[in-house]
Amino acid sequence: RLDDVIKLIKGPKGTQVFLTIKKVDGSTVVVPITRDVIELEEAFAKSTIIEKNNQRFGLIHLPRFYVDFSDYGNRNAASDVKKEIAKLKEEGVEGIVFDLRNNGGGSLQTVVDMAGYFIEDGPIVQVKSTGGQKQILSDLDKSIEWDGPLVVMVNEFSASASEILAAALQDYKRAIVLGSKQTFGKGTVQNVIDLNQIISNNTYGDLGAMKLTTDKFYRINGGSTQLEGVKSDIIFPNRYAYIDTGEKDQDNPLEWDKISPTEFNLWSSGDQYNYAIERSRKRLEDNPFVQLIDEQAKWIKSRQNDNDYSLNFDAYLEKNEATEQKTEK
């Protein structure tokens, strides 16, 4: 197993590990490797430029809201996104697409900093514990990194911190949210409680830890992201649009609720914002490829619980070929 191999290779930085590799011809060779910290670049923010109809648009992909909790000054999602925005501005892009698809969340502080790159200043998210006062986390920096057109892409697996960022930019009418009908719908905060620090004079050994849900996130308009997630302004179907994947589909999820909204100033009056949304929706309705994706998504849903397999080989092949033809569409 690969996991077992990785466990043997990993070790303290600077030490050596020797890999004995067997070649195809049967001979072996010993390769020494000095252990060091490995940074997987695909796990960090990156950008590219898309050119269409003589226009240039920037695409920023962020797989997670990463941070070094021991030192916020080190590389983190917010600082990396800021660098990518600067690169795209130098390239003269006319708009930016922020891709948060499959981003399961991460550091809340990086969300607050990141949202501030697109607005002057103001509240980003509200946090409230059971019976406690709500806390408003705000961007206090009036500088703006990007004031041009902005789109945020999401899907059913955009969760937690991703939902906070998408919700804030949507509430300000700063960005158009495009993607699945709604995001994952995780609007809760968990904390790990060390039981050894709670019970004094413990004679039972290590008591372990307990993970508790202690707080809930709320949009600046007062609504929670729990269960309902963030509704896309423009719904773009995907193959798994009808598969049950969200928080609402889990066992015993906490209910959606709302609190009082906080004061904030809209980025846009709404006219151009709403016009762009309506035009995009109309184009999607008339697009045959989009309709084909939706049909395939419904077909995948119909097969979700299909666990019957024929023991007749010819019947099995026939069904398999029909499935392949459907997926090739």
Where are the regions a protein language model picked out?
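A general structural signal for short secondary-structure boundary/capping elements
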Residues: 142-146, 198-203, 256-264, 277
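Cleft-lining beta-strand/loop regions that shape enzyme active-site pockets
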Residues: 1-199
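Polar, glycine-rich mid-to-C-terminal structural blocks
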Residues: 161, 173, 178-245
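Conserved functional hotspot residues or short segments at active or partner-binding sites
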Residues: 219-329
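Generic structural signal for residues positioned in beta-strands
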Residues: 32, 59, 123, 149, ...
